[in-house]
From Swiss-Prot:
This is Hemagglutinin-neuraminidase. Glycans are attached at N77, N499, N511. Its main location: virion. Residues 254-259 are annotated as: Involved in neuraminidase activity. One of its GO terms (cellular component) is host cell plasma membrane. Belongs to the paramyxoviruses hemagglutinin-neuraminidase family.
């Protein structure tokens, strides 16, 4: 037992000794470290477990939140869709409503309002235009004007050079410029269009022609067409006549021998209203009625008719007609050139040439003004003045050009270019040369004729192209000329280049002694009649419009045709 107790005692002793050994180890620094590591590991494990539990809980809550958000977004989408559809429907209804209102306004409301305002404005303008002092304002109510840089050719401005001397050149030969022509024509095969008259103003042009329904007889029933327009530039930068408004006057009025003036934004026309033929008219006392027409760019027209007793004459006339060519405006007066037969001849010596002509003296020249075919009336030119032409009843005053300053009275035209007035008269008598010069309308009235010696016109055998000696005859054809130089020595014209026949229309640039440049329109057999030439400048460059009555041979009728050329002016520098 003692051994046994010893053994146990030894065991416990040993045990105690072991524990003693452990306690001793714990108390050592290494033991304490191990204890703290164990505690830290345990705490880490516990914290990891707690974090894991928290993460799991967070995931569960997040999933629940996402499901909730998805449901919320879906609900919002449904709401947005509903709102969108509501707004779209509101916009659609509003657009439809406004469209209906706009359509109603466009179709009825606005036109009614515009028509009312237009009528009110027209009435206001018309009321104002009845007052003479507001005439200029009224003329500017429509803004239509030639293209920039275009104006009637003024010889004083055109015939000059920055360096050198202005001359007409023969090189290169002139040619026709391309472009449209919108001159009025006839709608009948046997119809005839006669007596073209063109006036180019500062703002617009006026063109008039006579449309005879059957044949070309002067007394035939006819329409008169007055056209207003402006000069534009085509794609080739050449000038064109561009019509804006046209008015056709009643065929029953039978206007004849009309002359035109373009002034401001209106066209003015003076015509004869003959009821008898020319020879019968010259055999009677007093003239046939005249009519003065006014046309504006809105198409409004006004006419004044005058009988012989309504007109103030300086001498009694048996017949008198406007001269076909254009007239001029000076302040409040329009002046047309006219011609006719005096009831009682004037005393004095007319223009005369006696050298190189056998058995010719001044009395032969004086007698040559009295035409047998026209009942021996003395035929003279006159100035037909229309005073206060915008008044309710303009006054017409006729002043005779002294026979001492003129040749045989005939058709012709007036041009006011700058401060100078030019006159052309048809060479209807023995004097076949071109008759163009400057006119002084002051008292006494005088004409300074340019001494042209190469340009002429065809005529009957006794007064043909080459005739130079005074004798009684009435012949020739209207082929006016446009002055390019201030003295009218240099001119542009379209001549019928033949001795006795109205054929071979030829555009010519000439001075008094030499034809410088010319262009035959077709051939020497081409039949033609009246021609008129008017010129303009475009920023200093010169162009001419040539209107020629061409005989449409296959139809045996006349029709004015428009041609254009560039003026062959050069500046010659002499060394």
């Amino acid at each position: 037992m003692a051994e046994k107790g010893k053994t146990n005692s030894s065991y416990w002793s040993t045990t105690r000794n072991d524990n003693s050994t452990v306690n001793t180890y714990i108390d050592t620094p290494a033991g304490k470290t191990h204890i703290w590591l164990l505690i830290a590991t345990t705490m880490h494990t516990i914290l990891s477990f707690i974090i894991m539990i928290l993460c799991i809980d967070l995931i569960i809550k997040q999933d629940t939140c996402m499901k909730t958000n998805i449901m919320t977004v879906s609900s919002m989408n449904e709401s947005a869709k509903t709102i969108k559809e509501t707004i779209t429907e509101l916009i659609r209804q509003e657009v439809i409503s406004r469209t209906i209102n706009i359509q109603s306004s466009v179709q009825s409301g606005i036109p009614i309002l515009l028509n009312k305002q237009s009528r009110d404005l027209t009435q206001l303008i018309e009321k104002s235009c009845n007052r003479q002092e507001l005439a200029q304002i009224c003329e500017n109510t429509i803004a239509i004007h030639h293209a920039d840089g275009i104006s009637p050719l003024d010889p004083h401005d055109f015939w000059r050079c920055p360096v050198g001397e202005p001359l007409l050149s023969n090189n290169p030969n002139i040619s026709l410029l391309p472009g449209p022509s919108l001159l009025s024509g006839s709608t009948t095969i046997s119809g005839c269009v006669r007596l073209p008259s063109l006036s180019i103003g500062d703002a617009i042009y006026a063109y008039s022609s006579n449309l005879i329904t059957q044949g070309c007889a002067d007394i035939g029933k006819s329409y008169q067409v007055l056209q207003l327009g402006y000069i534009s530039l085509n794609s080739d930068m050449y000038p064109d006549l561009k019509p804006v408004i046209s008015h056709t006057y009643d065929i029953n009025d039978n206007r004849k021998s009309c002359s035109v003036i373009a002034a401001g934004t209106r066209g003015y026309q003076l015509c004869s209203l003959p009821t008898v033929n020319e020879t019968t008219d010259y055999s009677s006392e007093g003239i046939e009625d005249l009519v003065f027409d006014i046309l504006d760019l809105k198409g409004k027209t006004k006419s004044h008719r005058y009988k012989n007793e309504d007109i103030t004459f300086d001498h009694p006339f048996s017949a008198m007609y406007p001269s076909v060519g254009s007239g001029i405006k000076i302040e409040n007066t329009l002046i047309f050139l006219g011609y006719g037969g005096l009831t009682t001849p004037l005393q004095g010596d007319t223009k005369c040439v006696t050298n190189r002509c056998a058995n010719v003296n001044q009395s032969v020249c004086n007698d040559a003004l009295k035409i047998t075919w026209l009942k021996k009336r003395q035929v003279v030119n006159v100035l037909i003045r229309i005073n206060n032409y915008l008044s309710d009843r303009p006054k017409i005053v006729v002043e005779t050009i002294p026979i001492t300053q003129n040749y045989l009275g005939a058709e012709g035209r007036l041009l006011k270019l700058g401060k100078k007035i030019y006159i052309y008269t048809r060479s209807s008598g023995w004097h076949s040369h071109l008759q163009i010069g400057s006119l002084d309308i002051n008292n006494p009235m005088t004409i300074k004729w340019a001494p042209h010696e190469v340009l002429s016109r065809p005529g009957n055998q006794d007064c043909n192209w080459y005739n130079r000696c005074p004798r009684e005859c009435i012949s020739g054809v209207y082929t006016d000329a446009y002055p390019l130089s201030p003295d009218a020595v240099n001119v542009a014209t379209t001549t019928l280049y033949a001795n006795t026949s109205r054929v071979n229309p030829t555009i010519m640039y000439s001075n008094t002694s030499e034809i410088i440049n010319m262009l035959r329109l077709k051939n020497v057999q081409l039949e033609a009649a009246y021609t008129t030439t008017s010129c303009i400048t475009h920023f200093g460059k010169g162009y001419c419009f040539h209107i020629v009555e061409i005989n449409q041979t296959s139809l045996n009728t006349l029709q004015p045709m428009l041609f254009k050329t560039s003026i062959p002016k050069i500046c010659k520098i002499t060394s």
